[in-house]
Amino acid sequence: MRKLYVKIFALSLICSQLIAPLKTLAQENQLVEVSGTVVDHESKQALPGVGVTIKGTVAGTTTDQKGNFKLRSKLKFPFYLVFSSVGFQTQEFQVKDLGAKLNIELETQSLLFNEVVITASRVPENILKSPVAIEKLDIRALRSSPAPSFYDALENVKGVQMTTASLTFKIPNTRGFNIPSNYRFMQLVDGIDMQAATLGVPLGNAIGPTELDIASIEITPGAASALYGMNAINGMSNLITKSPFLYQGLSFYQKGGINHLGGTGRDASGLSETAIRYAKAFNDKFAFKVNLSYLRGTDWLSDTRTDQNPNNLKSANPAFAALSGANNVAYDGWNKYGDDVLAGSNTVSLSGLTINGKPNQTLNVARTGYWEKDLVNPIVDNLKFDAAVHYRIGENTELSYDYRIGKMDGVFQRGNKIQLDNVIIQNHKLELKGSNFLVRAYMSLENSGDSYNVKPLADNLDLASGGSNSAWGTKYKTALNNYATQNGGLLTDQNLAAATAFARQQADAGRVEPGTPAFDALKKTIIGVNNWDIKSSTIPNATETGGAALVQRSRLYHVEGQWDLSKQVKYFNLLVGGDARVYEIIPDGNSFVDFSRPIADRGTPLADGSFGKNIYYKKVGAFTQLTKTLFQERLKIFGS
């Protein structure tokens, strides 16, 4: 009997030793539920929308309207919970076991010295420890901004200037490069480059987030090219959107306003913007969000009448004082196209004239041209949609897919202006991120829709309805001489202004005028033609009217990754990364051509409708970043 007890005791001891590790493993991997309430330390009122995350992981949730939260995850004790909310100090709380319900009190924070930024070093860090100058606008700053939209609030950031080319097209600039198209200022949304591949610049916030989905904006007004490439040599901005895990529910806003009050040239008009957002998370593992917005308004019309080519310039007619001011026959209007004397086009030189009794006199005369307000459409809109799906693979890893699409109208300015009409930009992004790594791939697609170039439109309106420059010049000279014959046979300072006005009227006979059905019909025809040349003996493949269409279709493929090796390196923090990018340009036979085809055939479509082989541009890059803190983090050495 005693032997039996000994055997049973030995067997029990062995089983307990085998079960103990399994029990420990089960404890380490058991599903732990932590719940509690978050309140304001001073008022003791519940705080809704407080972010609750597990430190060192991607797991998290937010408090409800009563300040309550519940978080389930497979954890090992002890662990830390991080509580954060706009306007309150971030607080960490250690959870040692499954005890009572947590009661957390957050203290208000008036000075945002402990804000965390990501853009400066590609890793989270205190804004005061950032190695470069960086500005951050969080939700509280954006809400309190007097700007009409969060995107306009960028103009209030130190070192940033905003250039407004159109109601839907606003361009942030830094370092004094205040130009309509800042190619070296990178604009990111959650790390994605928003540029349109063929235009080379982002189209404002055409497919960016709405105010309902923006979490913060980080702006680096100085060079950031070491970590982000040459496109960031003038600086960069990163628009960071809300996580569907942390910001759930349904949101909606409607804005309305009136612009051009008290202005001239047109009546006041309405401005409207509508947006809706919905986000939902399931079991802290899966979450999604959708955003939809629509903006519509009437753009400002450029209508400056300043003469860029006054009569005292050599490109005008300085020898004839009678042709000064309103009588300038070489007038080059600021917001007029088709009269571009200073550009060396749209002008004729009339020689062999006798003026004031002097033979062999020459007049420089500009074509009449068209005002910009008659060539562009001031009614603009911006419709955009985005959706995202997030899945937490583990405590430290999250996989997400984002899709964005936007349609916009507006005016884009380079050497001259481009009317953007039904431009569509799309973006697909797939991202895998962990506590110390990130892999991201995205694709952008651009389609310029029904856009057109304003200058060739004006040129071809004149050329198609008023004749070539030489033919128009001949009619002008003939009318000038006829006027002289009918008025004593002489051209003098006294009648030169009236004579040139009569000659222009005769030369413009048959020219289509704005506001007429003939003008609208010819304008529509020219906009639909993707060849800016008019048919002639030297350009036999062009159309009779010429064209102004801007047909640009392109794709951008990008992949990047980064790895934080700080835990593997003992003496300093090390971050490595790299990227690769491919631009795919589809030839249109006008703006972009297939150079492998004969010159005469590059503007002619092939049997399949294409204009040749697609054009590819490739880029690869890599970076290394080392940081070391010394003297109890009072000194930070940084190199990249």
Where do the model's predicted regions map?
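Transmembrane beta-barrel strands of outer-membrane/channel proteins
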Residues: 250-258, 290-296, 401-405, 439-445, ...
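Short, acidic, small-residue-rich periplasmic hinge/interaction motif at the N-terminus
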Residues: 31, 35-55, 80-88, 96-143, ...
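Short, acidic Ser/Thr/Gly-rich low-complexity loop/linker segments typical of extracellular
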Residues: 58-68
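Face-selective signature of the C-terminal outer-membrane beta-barrel domain
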Residues: 429-640
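Outer-membrane beta-barrel translocator/receptor signature
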Residues: 212-215, 221, 226-310, 381-383
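Short acidic/polar hinge/loop motifs at secondary-structure boundaries
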Residues: 70-72, 192-223, 276
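Extracytoplasmic beta-strand/coil segments of soluble accessory domains associated
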Residues: 72, 134, 151-196, 215-216
